[in-house]
From Swiss-Prot:
UniProt key word Transmembrane helix: yes
Originating organism: Chlorobium chlorochromatii (strain CaD3)
Spans traversing the lipid bilayer: 1-21
Biased composition (Basic and acidic residues): 47-63
Protein name in UniProt: Sec-independent protein translocase protein TatA
Subcellular localization: Cell inner membrane
Keywords: Cell inner membrane, Cell membrane, Membrane, Protein transport, Translocation, Transmembrane, Transmembrane helix, Transport
NCBIfam families reported in the protein's UniProt record: tatAE
Assembly behavior: Forms a complex with TatC.
Name of the coding gene: tatA
């Protein structure tokens, strides 16, 4: 995961704990989880739209080449 080892992750967690305090960590984690969920949803929508447009493209090309013949 991004080239981070266990020690680096523990260090980052300790820094976050010091910056935000133990009371804010659940709220921070909840917000981060919601943000990641929203990002994945948007990513899936974009991927589906791209695949859909790629599937529609050959059909349009076949129709135009057939009419040119």
């Amino acid at each position: 995961m991004f080239g981070l080892g266990g020690q680096e992750l523990v260090l980052i967690l300790l820094i976050v704990l010091l910056l935000f305090g133990a009371q804010k960590l659940p709220e921070l984690a909840k917000g981060l989880g919601k943000g990641m969920k929203e990002f994945k949803r948007a990513q899936n929508e974009i991927e589906e739209e791209f695949n859909k447009s790629m599937d529609d493209n050959p059909k349009k090309e076949k129709a135009t080449t057939a009419s040119k013949s």
